[in-house]
């Protein structure tokens, strides 16, 4: 941890909101899921929690990139680019449509490093989701800040698909709707001019949490099992310009290993799922 940001360690925020039938339906259709969306009293899928507990600030408190300005909850890190590097989840009790959810944010670690791409600052945030006094889920979120510009990476040998595989694609409308439902104003996901001309990406960036959500639904569908734990790590960005693949394999009786491969079969996201024992 860097002493410059000591006062932000342990900083907390709390949000209260109800899981509405309307938002459950909107996310269901945004993700193009099969079947009917959940109605009042029915369980939502585990990573629905990514739509909960996001900060809401007036437009004049947003930075150029669309995130809330730094210096309040997040420390005033001067590095220009922010990325969702990964997260770990543990699910204790299903969230349901109609639940009144309390989401607590807590900054648990701040680390500064110097890598091949320059200075990096990593922030770990613990989020806890309670319904009344019951802890329903936890998320350990990893955010990284950097000044480095996106680089054209050398291609590695193509990754081989696992036992399960599905080809997918997305588009600006779907990315915009997911941004809206998660109240994520980061412009790299819906503002093509900003993404390409300011941040230097070739296209719109597919949200890391959206890719993780697709993987979590994919493994639940393929295995027929309920999730106990899920973790993912972003390795390289995926863009709206090309298709990508979800792939995975069982790993023992109660786990699976998962990946997102881009259109060139390069590793974009890794993930692991642990199932509720049968």
Task: Report residues per predicted region.
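Charged, low-complexity, helix/coiled-coil-prone segments
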Residues: 43-48, 64-75, 148-164, 186-189
């Amino acid at each position: 941890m860097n002493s410059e940001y000591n006062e932000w360690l342990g900083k907390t925020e709390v949000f209260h909101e109800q899981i509405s039938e309307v938002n459950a339906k909107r996310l269901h259709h945004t993700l193009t899921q099969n079947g009917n969306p959940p109605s009042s009293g029915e369980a939502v899928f585990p990573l629905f929690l990514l739509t909960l507990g996001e900060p809401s600030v007036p437009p004049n408190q947003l930075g150029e990139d669309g995130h809330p300005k730094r210096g309040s909850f997040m420390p005033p890190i001067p590095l220009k680019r922010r990325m969702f590097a990964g997260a770990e989840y543990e699910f204790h009790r299903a969230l349901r449509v109609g639940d009144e959810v309390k989401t607590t944010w807590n900054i648990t670690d701040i680390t500064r490093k110097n890598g091949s791409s320059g200075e990096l600052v990593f922030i770990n945030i613990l989020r806890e989701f309670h319904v009344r006094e019951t802890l329903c889920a936890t998320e350990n979120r990893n955010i990284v800040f950097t000044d480095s510009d996106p680089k054209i990476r050398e291609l590695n040998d193509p990754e081989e698909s696992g036992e399960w595989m599905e080809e997918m694609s997305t588009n600006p409308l779907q990315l915009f709707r997911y941004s809206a439902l998660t109240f994520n104003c980061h412009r790299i996901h819906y503002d093509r001019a900003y993404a390409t001309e300011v941040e230097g990406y070739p296209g719109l960036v597919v949200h890391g949490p959206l890719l993780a959500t697709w993987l979590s639904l994919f493994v639940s569908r393929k295995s027929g099992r309920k999730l106990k734990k899920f973790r993912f790590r972003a390795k390289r960005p995926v863009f709206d310009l090309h298709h990508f693949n979800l792939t995975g394999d069982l790993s023992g009786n109660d786990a699976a290993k998962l990946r997102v491969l881009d259109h060139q079969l390069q590793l974009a996201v890794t993930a692991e799922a642990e199932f509720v024992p049968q």
